[in-house]
Amino acid sequence: MSDDRLIVALDVPNVVQGLALAEKLGDAVSFYKIGLGMLTGGGLALANELKQDHGKRIFLDMKLFDISATVEAAVRGLAQFNLDFLTVHGDPHVVRAAKEGAAGSDTKILAVTILTSLDRTDLDDCLIRDGEMLDLVAERAGRAFEAGADGVISSPHEATMIRALPEAKGRLIVTPGVRPTGSASGDQKRIATPRQAIADGADHIVVGRPIWQHQDPRAAAQMVVADLP
C-alpha cells in the first residue's frame, strides 16, 4: 500500500523514463514530484497522464519567480492541469499572485524558503544577509504564510521550528533533503531520514535518487514508507 506522505521525485530525463519508473513503482507510490529538468522533456504531459490515467497526485516543482502579473498568469494556466501542489519562491508578492492564479482550483501553493542544497556559505556567496539559517527560514516562512501560502518547502532541519509558528497552523510543510539511512546525501546539505522528517513536523517528504537509482525502486519506496512513524 502507498502512503501519500511520500512524494517520489521523477528526476529522470524524459516522459518515457518517467512513465517506465511510475510503472515499476505501481501502487507503491501515489504522489509524484515533477521538476524543471523533466518539464523540458515533456513534464506537463507526464503530469497530465499520471493524474488523469493513473489517478496519481502531482507536485509540480517550478519555483516560479517573476513579476506578479506573470506569476498569476502562469499559475492560472498550470492550475488547469488539476495539480495538487505547485511551488513558487516565498516572496510575498509572488505568493499573493500565485494564489490569485490558483483561485477556483484545488492546487495548493507552496512557498520555497531556502533550498535544501544551500548552507550559510552559499547564502554568503549569494549576498543574502547575515543570520542563522533557522532565523532566515522562519522569517521567510512567516511572510509566505501571511501572504496566503498553503504551505512551505523547507529542509527537515527547520520543520519543527516552522510547525511551531502561529501562522503555520493548518498549513503544509513539505521537506526535500530526505535520505533513508545509509543513502548518499548527493547534492543535499540539510538532510534527515524519512522517520525523523515526519516526526519533526513534515506533512510530506520528497525522495528521489534513493528510490529511482535503486535496483528495485518499488522495494526502495516500500522501505521508505515502512520507516514512517
UniProtKB/Swiss-Prot annotation:
Top-level division of the source organism's lineage: Bacteria
Keyword vocabulary terms for this entry: Decarboxylase, Lyase, Pyrimidine biosynthesis
Gene3D superfamilies per record: Aldolase class I
Binding site for substrate: 11, 33, 61-70, 116, 179, 188, 208-209
Cross-referenced SMART domains: OMPdecase
GO molecular function, one term: orotidine-5'-phosphate decarboxylase activity
Catalysed reaction equations from the record: orotidine 5'-phosphate + H(+) = UMP + CO2
Biological pathway: Pyrimidine metabolism; UMP biosynthesis via de novo pathway; UMP from orotate: step 2/2
Any GO BP annotation: 'de novo' UMP biosynthetic process
EC code(s) of this entry: 4.1.1.23
GO cellular component: cytosol
Active site: 63 (proton donor)
Subunit structure: Homodimer.
Stated role: Catalyzes the decarboxylation of orotidine 5'-monophosphate (OMP) to uridine 5'-monophosphate (UMP).
Family: Belongs to the OMP decarboxylase family. Type 1 subfamily.
The protein's name in its UniProt record: Orotidine 5'-phosphate decarboxylase
Organism of this sequence: Jannaschia sp. (strain CCS1)
Lineage of the species this protein comes from: Bacteria, Pseudomonadati, Pseudomonadota, Alphaproteobacteria, Rhodobacterales
